[in-house]
Amino acid sequence: MATGIPASELRELSNEELTTRLKESKEELFNLRFQMATGQLTNNRRLSVVKKDIARIYTVLRERELGLSTNPGGDAA
């Protein structure tokens, strides 16, 4: 049951919260890749889900950078 974070939920977060989520997701991806290399990974689907979550976070940040969406937590960066 590996489901990702919906983009609509990400759009409600501030830039600081998004960067925090991005950092956490990158750390999780690193750990999953390490588990895969050592043969300890039991849920292969989670690897793909985390990658897509990272892409969604980058997309929301880029939308704000281009002014396509607003930042609910403060000024548009």
UniProtKB/Swiss-Prot annotation:
SUPFAM superfamilies: Ribosomal protein L29 (L29p) (SSF46561). Pfam families: Ribosomal_L29 (PF00831). HAMAP family: Ribosomal_uL29 (MF_00374). The gene is rpmC. Keywords: Ribonucleoprotein, Ribosomal protein. One of its GO terms (molecular function) is structural constituent of ribosome. CDD domains: Ribosomal_L29_HIP. It comes from the Bacteria. This is Large ribosomal subunit protein uL29. Belongs to the universal ribosomal protein uL29 family. It comes from Corynebacterium urealyticum (strain ATCC 43042 / DSM 7109). One of its GO terms (biological process) is translation. InterPro entries: Ribosomal_protein_uL29, Ribosomal_uL29, Ribosomal_uL29_CS, Ribosomal_uL29_sf. GO terms for cellular component: cytosolic large ribosomal subunit.
